[in-house]
Amino acid sequence: MNNNLPTGSIAAAVDLLNKENVIAYPTEAVFGVGCDPDSETAVTRLLALKQRPVDKGLILIAASFEQLKPYIDDSILTAAQRKAVFDCWPGPVTFVFPAPATTPRWLTGRFDSLAVRVTNHPLVVALCNAYGKPLVSTSANLSGLPPCRTVEEVRAQFGDDFPVVEGATGGRLNPSEIRDALTGELFRQG
């Protein structure tokens, strides 16, 4: 079965996500692979594909802050902390928020927090809006290989039948910056 998705085929991508599949799509800097954050089956597939241990935790990417609220606890943020986050969103900055006990461990790993981002990539915004929630998002690359920056690189690493939402990345050279939402501490330079 050929799962390659034509440009703009958001409906086909949503159908695959509903079936607990992992898909690839362009983000601000590189292609990402993602899945339904509420499906342990889908997340397990993604972790196996990436050869990534569950205890490392994952990132959620969303079209809006509202989509992220069920997975994080922003109640302890001050007005200044909230402003610092929203000054960067939508955009290529990921923030680590406290996570409520209801957030699945397959997302948070060994942490009591979760990394989240409101993207400004139009294709990912459309995908998250059509799906109605955020996606787990991690760089599209197999262990030890560089992140994919084109559809062709995704196909070379994951195979011709791997489902890819075709489109261009946002042109950034580096993956998203990661910061602590409470302290502003920089975890990864963007």
Swiss-Prot record:
Superkingdom classification of source: Bacteria
Enzyme nomenclature, EC number: 2.7.7.87
Signal peptide: none
GO cellular component: cytoplasm
Molecular function terms, GO-annotated: ATP binding; double-stranded RNA binding; L-threonylcarbamoyladenylate synthase; tRNA binding
One annotated GO biological process: tRNA threonylcarbamoyladenosine modification
Function comment: Required for the formation of a threonylcarbamoyl group on adenosine at position 37 (t(6)A37) in tRNAs that read codons beginning with adenine. Catalyzes the conversion of L-threonine, HCO(3)(-)/CO(2) and ATP to give threonylcarbamoyl-AMP (TC-AMP) as the acyladenylate intermediate, with the release of diphosphate.
The protein's name in its UniProt record: Threonylcarbamoyl-AMP synthase
